[in-house]
């Protein structure tokens, strides 16, 4: 019987021999494998890593015990354990030994802080007694410094540019107490730990347990620090994964998904990020991440570690076999990669393209494709194929300089580069030539800015933008002032249905299972529903089982079960009081750094099995907003600064999830790049930047991975709330990109329900306002056909779930 699991909550184990898959050994091992695949070796002078067998280690830093598996909020996961770096190293006693004096000191200190209510990752770095430092040096000549960071949903990372603007979140205020200049930089206490270690030990390794970009200048050019492993936030087995790589059980193969600059102010977005709670001006326009650092004059000197960078314990060479271009612009590049070193390893080949300088400003390079090799033994080779498209080098003309509202391929030569980072590339002999400027894709204007005063150009200067009259996002919009007052006067209806019949007629109702069986069409089924039932279905439904993020459907008189939703981006999130522990997967930034869609697909499929096993139907992941600035508190939950890399990695997550008949939910649509005042902050952006950077991730995923659900964001986009934005939800998402699934709001938005439905938002979460919809329907401000359309989209997704 279809939906038996959802209807009767049997918690049927999905593993072999009646075993549960949730937090199973197979899943925690996969989590560790994925973590190892995305950790990035930033520095390794004199091949200090991997440690030789028998190496003695003095491990410094509270992060050795205060392990941060992931970020806070929807990205947090209830687990039965986490493996710290200290525990991970001790488990490898055949490879290394850890000085117990330091281990006991840090474990006790962290445990004491936890007992005082300090959150993981927010503990204070303790002062190391001089005598303990002396004993550690007597034990070994090799030190390992650990640093960790924690951030979360609802609050942004602190910086010296806060200008007194507070997020109001307790964790934000706690962070300010710990980090004097913001958590991008080392705290004073961390510096007091690092300096004596460098002065005392001839061999020093650093491990970073962080969720986003941090200062790297303190170790990058310091000869006293020989090796650095960016271990990110590695999930439930993250400490074990890092320990294994340090000991040579595997070779680091991660590549950076973001550019590491010298200082925070080197990121153009940092100056105005904390300027106001009310708005964010995207004045950097299309020059985000490496597009800025590789294009703007002088910006290249600000880079410490470039996009795509990452070392290995071995070396590789590659030879170009051939390049082919199809009529539709598809490029196929074949490369032979050989492991030329003495250690096994994987390499990532990256294909970049460059458009000619023309009338429209352009970045100097953009990523077109990439491919990761299999695990290559010394001397082994592999033929690798990269597939991209020259039309991805087109520029969107939002001002009509060449051709209004169109992607344009300007006249001239297009060059291509192959390498293992955006900096370390070789130009291919192949050149694509446009004899004359042509329109690659004609579109229509969407999301024109109303308040953005200027935007950056390729030479680093700024141009003024024509803007439309500003718009109050809470103005009457579709309603007159009087009508708005009437509807706004209705209190939100959060009295969820408990199964009472909304239908007063005694005749037999068509059942939803008949639609699934094919004996009744979806049109026929929806046509029988009353206005009240339609309004009921367009809102979230009460929690059942272990869920805490509410559900969809729940119309028992017509056989529609209550389909539960659940967070989140780092694993199935179930509240601790429910007593169910799940697998914490590595954070999204780490998954992006794997540059390996196949392993992300495996993580998605495994996570979806845990979702199914716990009677959840809709998984609220992946989150795919762009890393515009290191300061966004939710960057750990997002993937990268590059829209192509995000789309390919997160798209694999979507495909993996939906292979298990669980609905993936791509979020937050769109331009949700700041957590402070996220429900009322206006993202002011040009149409070109929106299309080429911030919406391109969603567009590619919609077209290639075909997600069943999308979540609109809290924020305002160019003066219109995202959840009420017809340009976003209808013109772009459905009319241009062909999205056929359901759009839900983020939880408890400030948007008005009838305006959201009219804009294309199908379900208001966590609860709807049926009275608002019915009054709008009565006044002619909302059509029944519009409600039916949203309900059909919702039920269409529920039909796919099993």
Label the model's feature ranges.
Residues 424-444:
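Short beta-strand elements
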């Amino acid at each position: 019987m279809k939906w038996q699991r959802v209807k009767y909550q049997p918690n049927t184990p999905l593993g072999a021999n009646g075993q549960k898959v949730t937090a199973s050994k197979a899943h925690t091992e996969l989590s560790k494998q994925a973590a190892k695949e995305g950790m990035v070796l930033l520095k390794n002078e004199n091949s200090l890593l991997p440690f030789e067998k028998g190496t003695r280690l003095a491990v410094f830093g509270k992060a050795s015990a205060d392990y941060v598996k992931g970020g806070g909020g929807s990205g947090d996961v209830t687990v039965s354990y986490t493996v710290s770096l200290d525990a991970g190293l001790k488990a490898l006693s055949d490879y290394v030994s850890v000085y117990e004096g330091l281990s006991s000191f840090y474990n006790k200190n962290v445990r004491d802080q936890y007992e005082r209510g300090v959150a993981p990752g927010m503990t204070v770095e303790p002062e190391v007694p001089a005598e303990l430092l002396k004993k550690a040096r007597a034990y070994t000549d090799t030190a390992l410094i650990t640093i960790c960071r924690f951030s979360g949903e609802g609050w942004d990372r602190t910086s010296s540019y806060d200008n007194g603007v507070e997020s109001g979140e307790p964790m934000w205020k706690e962070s300010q107490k710990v980090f004097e200049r913001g958590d991008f930089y080392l705290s004073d206490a961390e510096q007091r730990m690092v300096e004596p270690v460098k002065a005392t030990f001839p061999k020093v390794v650093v491990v970073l347990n962080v969720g986003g970009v941090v200062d790297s200048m303190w170790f990058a050019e310091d000869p006293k620090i020989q090796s650095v492993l960016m271990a990110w936030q590695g999930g439930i087995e993250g400490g074990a994964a890092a320990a294994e790589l340090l000991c040579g059980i595997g070779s680091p193969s991660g590549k950076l998904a973001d550019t590491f600059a010298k200082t925070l102010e080197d990121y153009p977005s940092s100056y105005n990020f904390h300027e106001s709670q009310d708005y964010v001006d995207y004045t950097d326009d299309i020059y985000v991440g490496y597009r800025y650092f590789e294009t703007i004059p002088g910006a290249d000197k600000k880079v410490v570690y470039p996009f795509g960078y990452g070392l290995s314990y071995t070396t590789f060479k590659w030879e170009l076999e051939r390049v082919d271009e199809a009529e539709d612009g598809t490029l196929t590049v074949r490369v032979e990669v050989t492991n030329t070193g003495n250690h096994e390893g994987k390499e990532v080949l990256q294909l970049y393209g460059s458009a000619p300088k023309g009338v429209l400003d352009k970045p100097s390079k953009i990523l077109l494709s990439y491919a990761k090799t299999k695990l290559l033994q010394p001397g082994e080779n592999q033929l690798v194929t990269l597939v991209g498209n020259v039309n991805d080098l087109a520029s969107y003309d939002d001002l009509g300089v060449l051709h209004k509202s169109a992607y344009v391929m300007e006249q001239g030569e297009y060059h291509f580069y192959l390498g293992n980072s955006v900096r370390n590339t070789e130009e291919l002999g192949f050149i694509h030539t446009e004899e004359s400027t042509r329109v690659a894709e004609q579109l229509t204007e969407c999301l024109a800015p109303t308040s953005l005063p200027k935007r950056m150009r390729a030479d680093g200067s700024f141009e003024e933008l024509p803007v439309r009259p500003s718009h109050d996002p809470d103005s009457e919009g579709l309603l007159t002032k009087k009508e708005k007052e009437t509807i706004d006067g209705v209190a939100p209806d959060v009295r969820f249905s408990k199964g009472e019949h909304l239908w007063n007629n005694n005749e037999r109702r068509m059942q939803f299972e008949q639609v699934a069986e094919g004996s009744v069409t979806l049109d026929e089924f929806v046509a029988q529903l009353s206005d009240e039932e339609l309004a009921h279905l367009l809102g979230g439904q009460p929690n059942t089982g272990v869920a805490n993020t509410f559900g969809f459907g729940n119309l028992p008189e017509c056989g529609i079960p209550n389909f539960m939703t659940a967070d989140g981006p780092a694993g199935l999130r179930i509240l601790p009081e429910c007593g169910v522990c799940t697998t914490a997967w590595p954070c999204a930034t780490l998954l992006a750094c794997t540059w390996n869609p196949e392993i992300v697909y495996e993580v998605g499929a495994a996570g979806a099995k845990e979702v199914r096993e716990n009677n959840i139907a809709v998984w609220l992941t992946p989150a795919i907003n762009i890393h515009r600035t290191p300061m966004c508190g939710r960057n750990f939950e997002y993937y990268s600064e590059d829209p192509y890399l995000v789309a390919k990695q997160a798209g694999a997550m979507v495909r993996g999830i939906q292979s298990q008949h669980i609905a993936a939910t791509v979020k937050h649509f769109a331009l949700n790049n700041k957590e402070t005042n996220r429900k009322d902050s206006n993202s002011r952006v040009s149409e070109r930047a929106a299309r080429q950077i911030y919406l391109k991730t969603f567009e590619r995923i919609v077209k290639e991975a075909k997600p069943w659900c999308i979540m609109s964001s809290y924020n305002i986009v160019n003066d219109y709330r995202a959840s009420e934005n017809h340009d976003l939800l209808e013109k772009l998402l459905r009319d241009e990109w062909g999205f056929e699934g359901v759009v839900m709001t983020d939880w408890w938005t400030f948007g008005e329900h009838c305006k959201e439905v009219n804009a294309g938002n199908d379900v208001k979460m966590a609860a709807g306002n049926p009275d608002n919809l019915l009054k709008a329907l009565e006044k002619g401000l909302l059509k029944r056909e519009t409600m039916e359309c949203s309900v059909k989209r919702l039920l269409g997704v529920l039909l796919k779930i099993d």
